Each structure stands twice: as structure tokens, then as C-alpha cells.
Regions:
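Helix-coil-helix junctions within alpha-helical repeat/solenoid scaffolds
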Residues: 1-193
Length: 193
């Protein structure tokens, strides 16, 4: 999440890879598998990523009837999309992750945990230039949770790219108002303690 917001995370991915490599064929949880795969991909562990993708495809082929849809429609395309994102192939990432997104809930995890995949998908859409799809997602997010400054900032950036200056400025203003409100609330809470 930090990298998606422009923060340099240094060698943290490489540090994680040490713990992730032994889990390439584990498959105890599809939810964990896709996280492991993304960590390996971000660490640049190409051979481990290739091995894990093949192992995930094999696991999908052996899925029991009740889990076939999860593996075929969510896990495999999501894993390939995450690998593509880490490799910088944003069009492939956007396409494959887009296939998986409708099935994401069946993967498990909390809403906040699954939101990471939504953020990566949105990043892929934006960086691939699929602005209409990115805009639709951001507008839906804004309707669902209108008080999130980060969504307003993302909308502002996209509106700027689309040449919609008036909408961009409005979104920037709303983001700043929300951020100011949150900072004041934190200050008041700190003073009360």
C-alpha cells in the first residue's frame, strides 16, 4: 500500500522473499497464496514466481467441485495479474485482475485486506491508460464512502489527466477539506487525553 502511495519501501520485499520462497507450493489458503506470489514478484524473484504460477495452475486443475470457480475465476487470473503488475505490464495486470475482481469476496480475508487487490487493480488501470475503467471504480468508491480523502485525491489526479480541470480542482478542494477535518479531530482528541 505504501508503494502505491509513492513511498519507497527499500529492501523490504527482498527481506520477505526469504520467508515466502519455501511456501511456493504450500497452497493452504488461496488468500495467502496470492499475497505470497505478489511478495515474490515485487522482490524480483522471477523463477519463484514462475514456479508458483505453475503450481497454482496445477492446484486449480485439481480443485474440488466446490472450489473450482474460486481457483479458475479468481485465484489464477489474480495471481497472473499481480505478477504482471509487479513486472510493469499494466495492461495485462488490468485485464487479468479485472477478470478476478467479481470473485474476490470468495477468496476470503477482510474487506480491508481485499481492498489491497482493488488498489493494485486501480493502479494498473490508471498506469495502462484505461482511464474510463479507473474513473468508474473511483466514482463508485466515492459514492460508497464519500468521506475518504485518498479517493478524492485519486479522482483529482485522474481528472487532471483527462483534462477535466474544474472537476480536478473540486476534488482537490474536497480532499483538503476532509484532511483538515481529520487533522483537527486528531488534535482535539490529543488535547482531551
Amino acid at each position: 500500500r505504501l508503494e502505491l502511495r509513492g513511498v519507497d519501501v527499500g529492501a523490504r520485499w527482498a527481506d520477505l522473499a526469504t520467508y515466502l520462497k519455501p511456501r511456493v507450493r504450500e497452497h493452504l489458503s488461496a488468500f495467502h497464496d496470492v499475497h505470497y506470489l505478489y511478495g515474490l514478484a515485487r522482490a524480483g524473484e522471477r523463477s519463484a514466481v514462475t514456479e508458483m504460477l505453475a503450481s497454482l495452475e496445477d492446484r486449480a486443475a485439481r480443485a474440488k467441485p466446490f472450489e473450482r470457480e474460486l481457483w479458475a475465476d479468481c485465484v489464477v487470473p489474480l495471481a497472473h495479474g499481480l505478477a504482471a503488475h509487479a513486472a510493469g505490464d499494466m495492461s495485462t495486470a488490468a485485464r487479468l485482475m479485472g477478470q478476478a475482481m467479481p470473485y474476490l469476496r470468495s477468496l476470503g480475508g477482510s474487506i480491508a485486506q481485499r481492498a489491497l487487490f482493488g488498489a493494485i487493480h486501480l493502479d494498473a488501470l490508471s498506469r495502462a491508460g484505461w482511464n474510463d475503467a479507473a474513473l468508474a471504480i473511483l466514482q463508485a468508491d466515492e459514492r460508497e464512502r464519500p468521506g475518504v480523502a485518498a479517493t478524492k485525491r485519486a479522482l483529482a489526479a485522474l481528472y487532471h489527466r483527462l483534462g477535466r480541470t474544474e472537476q480536478a480542482l473540486a476534488a482537490e478542494y474536497q480532499a483538503e477539506q476532509l484532511a483538515r477535518h481529520y487533522r483537527q479531530a486528531v488534535t482535539r482528541t490529543g488535547e482531551a487525553a
